[in-house]
Amino acid sequence: MSTRCAIGLKRENGEVAAIYCHNDGYPEGVGAILGRWYRNAEKVEALLKLGSISSLGAKLEPEAGAEHAFFNRQQDVTYAYHRDRKDPETSATVYPSVKSYSENARKDFWADFLYLFDNGKWLVFGSNGDWVEIKTEK
């Protein structure tokens, strides 16, 4: 069974851009990877440019010249539907505010968890309806 999630970035204008992630969306999976490996807005923007992803890895790009395919994935590399499986390209969904993201992204993405990179910190939308900071080892 997949644990789906949405990964979002709050931009300076208050909008939230978000993508879908199909696997390991729980805080100990995607949450831990985001907190450890995606620590600045530039890297999060690069992740969002991939569009929808099957799985999140510590690395965004596969090694040059090495195969990275659905049944032969490089270890710790993000697997993107368009780039790696040649599915139609998808772009990030943009919400006008964090409130809109909180209220709509779960149903839009069929997501169990929502993540948000806001002002240098990763947050997860908790089951109590609040954003909670993800604490990870550095």
Which residue ranges define each predicted feature?
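Extracellular/luminal recognition modules and glycoprotein regions
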Residues: T3, G25-L34, V77-T78
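Low-complexity intrinsically disordered segments
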Residues: G35-K138
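Short, extreme N-terminal segment that most often corresponds to the first beta-strand
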Residues: M1-Y26
